[in-house]
Amino acid sequence: MVRIVVFILLCVRFSAPAEHCNAQMKSGPWRIKSLPIAAPKETLQKDVEIEIVETDLDQNVVIGYKGYYQAYAYNGGSLDPNSRVEETMKTLDVAKEDLLMWGIRQQCEVGEELIDQWGSDSESCFRNMDGRGVWVAGKELVKRQNNNHFAHHTCNRSWRCGVSTAKMYTRLECDDDTDDCKVTILDINGTSINVTENKVLHRDGVSMILKQKSTFSRRTEKVACLLIKDDKADPNSVTREHCLVDNDIFDLSKNTWFCKFNRCIKRRSENVVKQRPHTWRHDRPPKHDEGATATKGDLMHIQEELMYENDLLRMNLELMHAHINKLNNMMHDLIVSVAKVDERLIGNLMNNSVSSTFLSDDTFLLMPCTSPPPHTSNCYNNSIYKEGRWVANTDTSQCIDFNNYKELAIDDDIEFWIPTIGNTSYHESWKDASGWSFIAQQKSNLISTMENTKFGGHTTSLSDIADMAKGELNATLYSFMLGHGFTFVLIVGVILFLVCMLRNRPSHY
């Protein structure tokens, strides 16, 4: 009997592992916690059918202007109340046929320059008021007010004109009910003006007409859209809907036409769009067509792009989080299954020296254990790590030093798709269009010539320095010399007469 007891003790001694667990200090019961898997608020919907209507960003507009300055004067002397200068400054509307011909010839037609027409010639001020017969590439008027012909009328008339085929920006507008679209021209403030190929528009001192009729094209495409649901309680509600069209981002949240510059886009929405955040409300006018200086519309569109990128990033993070939680729950099931065979698995995963004992399929107890210190061999004292356990070992030939181990890659690193900002197209301010620059320049030229000319233009001549009309200085000097010469002769004659009288007087002695 004693031999049997000794044999059992020896077996226990040589078979005991290098670690021991205390069954008296069990804790629990425990159950691995499952992680919640939440669906993202963002949904990426592919193959969304949209309709795109597009026109040219700008159109060729023929712009022309014509006018004249006229001074009809009468010189009756300073004592005559009828002495006056009647000034007329008039801008003429250019007819459609004339404007089209101007555009073809790149010349404008005016009347003959009338310079210092006096006497009967001054009647020219009442003829050829429409300005015909002289073709020029463009000219500015010269202000003349000659009135130096005594007791006569004087006429001066000078013409101005110009023509240019320039670009003006367009805006495409589509009706939400009928889907009819039209192209309008934008003025310097970005406001639509009625410039067509059939009728001349007269405004701002110029006449303008479209060189050819504006056209637009329609096409249907399938694109990808990102749907944002801010209300998790209502899965059918959509707050924003970003669609990627030709590498550009558009907000198509409502079943209406979204028009930006020269393009309109519309989709048939199946979702209920709720009220959007205060900075993005559909009941306010769209901000993408506010073509102010620095193109505010482009800046607003960049903000739309940033919102899209933020929503897309948030969707990717939420999808990743949900997927990781799903993988974690699958890993939990796998750990529970393996831990029923390897009682130290759960402790090793928690980096604690504990052992598990299962009470049911997913409930277990934990007990503290002792572990050998870190080592670089599969042997420790009289134990060997074998088949996932520390067991007794008497054969030292089975010990292996794994200090110089090698790593074996069994999977690849994940490559993420990094989103980038869309290909935003930038637009100049409306007032930067060449057509409005031409109009502004002709106004500047008119102001300059009216300020700097009076008698045909300032030069270095004495008449211009004295601010006198042509011939007026000559007449003044002639009158001055003639008057003073007559006075001189008269005085000399009187003196000679007196001298003669004194000499002929008889002497009395």
Swiss-Prot record:
Glycans are attached at residues 156, 189, 194, 351, 381, 423, 474. A lipid is attached at residue 479 (O-palmitoyl serine). One of its GO terms (cellular component) is viral envelope. Keywords: Fusion of virus membrane with host endosomal membrane, Fusion of virus membrane with host membrane, Glycoprotein, Host cell membrane, Host membrane, Lipoprotein, Membrane, Palmitate, Phosphoprotein, Signal, Transmembrane, Transmembrane helix, Viral envelope protein, Viral penetration into host cytoplasm, Virion, Virus entry into host cell. The keyword Transmembrane helix applies. Residues 1-17 form the signal peptide. It comes from the Viruses. GO terms for biological process: fusion of virus membrane with host endosome membrane; symbiont entry into host cell; symbiont-mediated perturbation of host process. It is a single-pass membrane protein. Palmitoylated. Belongs to the baculoviridae gp64 family. Envelope phosphoglycoprotein which mediates the fusion of viral and host endosomal membranes leading to virus entry into the host cell. This is Major envelope glycoprotein.
